[in-house]
Amino acid sequence: MSQGSQVHIFLGAPVAPLKTTVSQGTASLMSTANAWEKVRLFYKQHSLYLKAGDQEFKNLEDCQVPKGLGPPGLLSGDVLTTSVRRSAQVDEDFKHSASEAQSVKSQVNLSDMTSGQMCGLGDGVQHLPEEEKDQKLQCKNKKITDEQSKNQSDPCVRNFQRDLFALDLKCAAKLDLGCCTEQMSTGTKPEPTGHRERQSQESFSDTRCEPQSEGAVRKASDQRLSAEAEFLSVLTSSQRAFLAQGNDKGQDCINKSTVNMEAEPTGSQGVRRTEGDFSKPGGDFEEESENEQSQVYSLELFSPVCPESESSHSHINPGKNLENTSSQELFSNEENLPPNELCSSHPSTANRSWSCKDDSHHSKALSEVHQVSKKPRMDSNIREAAKAVPQRVMSELKDSKKISLIKNCDSKNQKYNCLVMVLTPCHVKEITIKSGPNSGSKVPLATIVVIDQSEIKKRVVLWRTAAFGALTVFLGDIILLTDVVLYEDQWIGETVLQSTFTSQLLNLGSYSYVQPEKYSNVIANVILQDLLTYVSTKHSYLKDLPQRQPQKMNTVEFVELEQLQPDILVHAVLRVVDVTVLTEALYSYRGQKQRKVVLTVEQAQGQHYVLVLWGPGAAWYTQLQRKKDSIWEFKYLFVQRNSILENLELHTTLWSSCECLFDDDTRAISFKTKFQKNTSSFVKISDLATHLEDKYSGVVLIKAKVSELVFSAAAAQKIALNARSTLQSIFSSLPSIVYAGCAHCGSELETDENRIYRQCLSCLPFVGKKIFYRPALMTIVDGRYNTCVHVGSKMMEQILLNISPDCLNRVIVPSSEVTYGMVASDLLHSLLAVSAEPCVLKIQSLFELDENSYPLQQDFSLLDFCPDSRKLWSPGLSLRAEGTGGIPGKE
């Protein structure tokens, strides 16, 4: 057998019982000598091969797909051939399949497919002249139409068409999904030195997009975006959710801002956002607002080779930033803001503003968004001007943009503006430049496949900043691409359209809901209506795509993590379990490098989710680390699906906020009630006598009194605290029950003859030092039964209400002489007193039994602690310091 994956296509199969087989009349057209002849599709190293009987075709494009079997909307074979011809690249010299080539049609009448022979278009991908192509297509379409009329009345054919329609709809929506999320790298072919844009173009031409069978073998790290690109993707997606608000059609978006891009001398790009350009042209407000806002928020949109871009955007006014604006203020004037367009990118030395249209909930923005000005100065005149679409920007588009059909884009020295429909959207990926002065830097890249009324499919390559504009488009969207150029990819022999530094992307929305009159001042109604007519005729299946519903900002709700949906904004009350800083995941924000901060959060015990802190949210790290295991309320989080792990993750946005909840807060009480309900089935509740008799190994809740605490100090010295210990003796023992240890592993550090701490050799090069409480052996008593429980350093700190051991000598307030050590001593004295109330202890027990079930060894470890059993308590949520960062609570 041949190596590699094989797809067997049986020709001439009987009608019953398969639903998708053709009628007997159609099958009779096949040769009856070999009723079950097979066409084998071999996946080999360099291409896809077909073999029919003894005939072998050099390429998948040589085998024609029977178009007569498709539904009327698929007669052109666009979706069928696209879904069949998934790109598969495994080597540098692999050629892209015909689904991405320039207007390659693979059409054949079913009657032409005789036994042992199939007609092809020749070897490889053919680029025919437009006139010759049109003549051939007309001739073949005529034959297909005749055959279609014969087969249309047959019920079996209709069943086949229906199933094929559903299949192609799915394929069209998910085409190239496996390749979209893969990180791409440039090839090793030689390239001429010159302009960086040229170098990037050639690096794209040799990118590899492996099939899913190969992608499953690849490491996930090879497919991940860099932290920089991931940050910008999340930023874009969250802004799409922020802007995707409008009327019942989901077309009009709130006017947020326009984007001004500046072309760097080396070709790098940065984002500068100004408050809406709908103000009076040339007025003081426009000029002052532009200068002010561009300095406040300058986000570098991926220029790894231009360090001066960071310095040029590093002038930030810390007093004027969006994260300092409350969420209520941020969205208070939402309903009063006018509809406007979602923006992509437009750099120019003159800071020419522009804007484009987003359609609905699923559209995404490249630019950062300003909902409210840092200084609310939108007077009545500006509000009146803001109620209409910015006429200056729209007239600029109208005056300077001449729309061309794809078939007329034939000159490499000219910029074109194309009104097209999206056939294949794509995620943002990255390529790594392997040679030249920019070697090692990564460039964001996205590729979409579009079509217009000239019936020519064309790949559009979006580079750098424009690549994130691909996140704003979806299957069936009508978009206006401006200032794109023709580029001939010499590596694969294909011509594509690619973005330039002045390219714009105007999304008119899904073709079923586009209203031409709204864009009459930008796009001629005749051109737009012509495209809509073509799409409704040739791609009518897209009409069944569900309408994307916008999300209103005033309807953002608190959600349960189990009910998360992707691509929406949510509020959530969460318990922070862990905080991790990824030191190697760096991205640029406000002119500085920031590390990616990942939180592990939960709403039910053991059900962990990921919350990533981006941009301004990274500043919460210190607070969250200090109050870990507390309950927090997060607002305006964006839900995104991880393309590698396929799980849902939470991401902070520019409008996110967080608040640590006190234990007596109604929101915290409600959270604890749900948490306790979710965890009650996992924890066994027992008394000490029953537990010792059952010899149960596991996690149990036991109600008992603490009678003694024994600390093992240095030099084999033991410090025992019990009911007979006085408050003064406990206070004097505090220096002995703390020690200086390695901040990484917690082991106690020794001192040399100069009383200098020695380094922890096992943790080098980490040399941090931290003060810890010594572990203790706690004796608990329940009636006449008692046992010993091991208490770790962290649990001792928790028992003392999170009073840090390094602040025992500090006074609580400057005017008082009461120190935290006095408070800790009083807590221990009250806990060990004879009159003390029993405590609820969460214990991990382990029994080692012999053959007679006699305990040879028993071990107990304290997992959680609640000093007052009368209070509402849930496992895993003991009494914490209430918003004081280690300061005792209200008790």
From Swiss-Prot:
The keyword Transcription does not apply. Residues 695-866 are annotated as: Mediates interaction with SHLD1. Keywords: Chromosome, DNA damage, DNA repair. It is found in: Chromosome. It comes from Mus musculus (Mouse). It comes from the Eukaryota. Component of the shieldin complex, which plays an important role in repair of DNA double-stranded breaks (DSBs). During G1 and S phase of the cell cycle, the complex functions downstream of TP53BP1 to promote non-homologous end joining (NHEJ) and suppress DNA end resection. Mediates various NHEJ-dependent processes including immunoglobulin class-switch recombination, and fusion of unprotected telomeres. This is Shieldin complex subunit 2. Belongs to the SHLD2 family. One of its GO terms (cellular component) is actin cytoskeleton. Residues 1-542 are annotated as: Interaction with ASTE1.
